[in-house]
Amino acid sequence: MSNRRETRAQAQQFIDNLKPLQHPNSEKVYLEGSRPDLKVGMRQIHQSDTLVAGDEANPVFEANPPLKVYDCAGAYSDPDANIDVRKGLEKFRENWIEERGDTVQLTSASSGFTQQRLADDGLDHLRFESLLPPRRAKEGKRVTQLHYARQGIITPEMEYIAIRENMAKSEVTDPILTQKDKGESFGAVIGEPITAEFVRQEIARGRAIIPLNINHPEAEPMIIGRNFLVKVNANIGNSAVTSSIEEEVEKLVWSTRWGADTVMDLSTGRYIHETREWIIRNSPVPIGTVPIYQALEKVNGVAEDLNWETFRDTLIEQAEQGVDYFTIHAGVLLRYVPMTAKRLTGIVSRGGSIMAKWCLSHHKENFLYEHFREICEICAAYDVSLSLGDGMRPGSIADANDEAQFSELETLGKLVKVAWEYDVQTIIEGPGHIPMNLIKENMDKQLEVCDEAPFYTLGPQTTDIAPGYDHFTSGIGAAMIAWYGCAMLCYVTPKEHLGLPNKDDVKQGLIAYKIAAHAGDVAKGHPSAQIRDNALSKARFEFRWEDQYNLGLDPETARAYHDESLPQESAKVAHFCSMCGPKFCSMKITQEVRDYAAAQEREAEARVIDIKSATEYDSYTGSESDTAKRASQREQGMAQMSAEFKAKGAELYHEASHKQPDVALED
């Protein structure tokens, strides 16, 4: 069997046998809102107890409470869920959409292309089985979360998000876990706690978006904005030369397991329409696309043959399938294209290069720019958010922050205000390849010219010397720009610039970017961010190895690394690791120092009482003989302590009476 067939067969087997999967020592829990159908899924990590006193025969333990953390996996982490990818996930938002009374269910698809695909019997074997008629806004209505927010309406989606973003912080009372630095937010103002009204205000202001198409009721509400947790997007999608529907569905599920807040389907090969349907129906997270990719497929890959009619039909096709946000390269203007001629790497954005070629071949203005108001009308009818693409982003650090990049950014700033006229939720895409010293300029300029609309960046990549490790080179920039105010980070995998990522690449990219996002949250002072850090640090100091693994982003890898050098089960309770060993473990020594210091403090208090009594008996007169007497007493005391030290073996540290005995490792 060829590698391609084997990979596809493995993906098919994954789908056929798909069951909910939980991380170690975790369970799915639900926090209830103000109505019975509003239940917010979280992952609850259980911890072991801490030994605080007693001896081996009578130990005294202190409980460590379970910790609730953000969970992107939806039903895929709920053991009670009935998973069937051929039927899709539960449409739990359907009732919320229907009860608003501002949408209508269509009798058939509006897109001509969709109608052609449905009429093609040759596609039956690829088609998703449980198709439902699409919805759109009633005539004269706008059904976007931005529209509701501006009307002062708090939707169930907004309440859901408020509960989710707080991560049950109110349940954490241990000051060891709640301690945090105030952070440096660079102007961001984060609610504490985050309320549904705060969510509504941020949406109404345009500083945040809730990307939820009315035709994607399976998606769990989430928010993208600088005053909330930094989010991470994962890219998947087939190409003309590799991957399949089965593999992309597998990557979707895999992405949500490892923390993808949104997923972009960047498919460019055959069966784009069918692949997307399978992905959306099985996705608990918002799905984004770049519609120009499919429009190009419809004109046989000839950029010059693109036209507004084909693109418009593609927007409607995807909106009625349930795509939650579109990347639109409407800022690539004809006059900006010559600015890229002196660049080292030219135009590296696929969508940007397509539109640049169209503009030059016709010597006309970008038709996406010319028809932008019509694009907004379509989005307002389905609540599709816009992600204004950075077609002029730099593809090397040599091209960073140049005239072409910032000219486009200023155009995007104007377009976001047009989108807001139509109550269309909008974010701005950013670079790219930017050295560390130029990253903050990008963030500051975006906030200024785009009126604080959420920023969504690819990295940025801080150096160009490490193909195969660009999840590192870009993770550095991602952490920095997340701190400065970026709302969502698009992950980069080890395969960036080299090939299409597989499952493991997706995981590696996501872990790198979840680290970057979390580091940004901690640095800007998000109220709930540092609790998990503190819990893991406490577990580490107390040698609770299993808790260290389970509180981390990737428990399996942490456990595997530990077991490489200390595979014995007894090592899971040992008070050292293989890095320093039992004699030089800094945390073990620190614990002994604390115990020794506490014992000395108790002894000192007792001696102070004795000295005070003696002094009162033999009152101080200030004479030279008394001074000499006190000096002699001090010397005698020091000599006594020296003798005691030697008598106890001349060891620097001694075992504390309540310390758990060392465990002898098996050979």
Swiss-Prot record:
Cofactor: [4Fe-4S] cluster
Protein name as catalogued: Phosphomethylpyrimidine synthase
Record function comment: Catalyzes the synthesis of the hydroxymethylpyrimidine phosphate (HMP-P) moiety of thiamine from aminoimidazole ribotide (AIR) in a radical S-adenosyl-L-methionine (SAM)-dependent reaction.
An example Gene Ontology CC term for this record: cytosol
UniProt key word 4Fe-4S: yes
Species this chain originates from: Shewanella pealeana (strain ATCC 700345 / ANG-SQ1)
Gene: thiC
Disordered, as annotated region: 618-642
InterPro entries: ThiC, ThiC-associated_dom, ThiC/Bza_core_dom, ThiC/BzaA/B
EC number(s) on file: 4.1.99.17
Binding site for [4Fe-4S] cluster: 577, 580, 585
Cofactor note: Binds 1 [4Fe-4S] cluster per subunit. The cluster is coordinated with 3 cysteines and an exchangeable S-adenosyl-L-methionine.
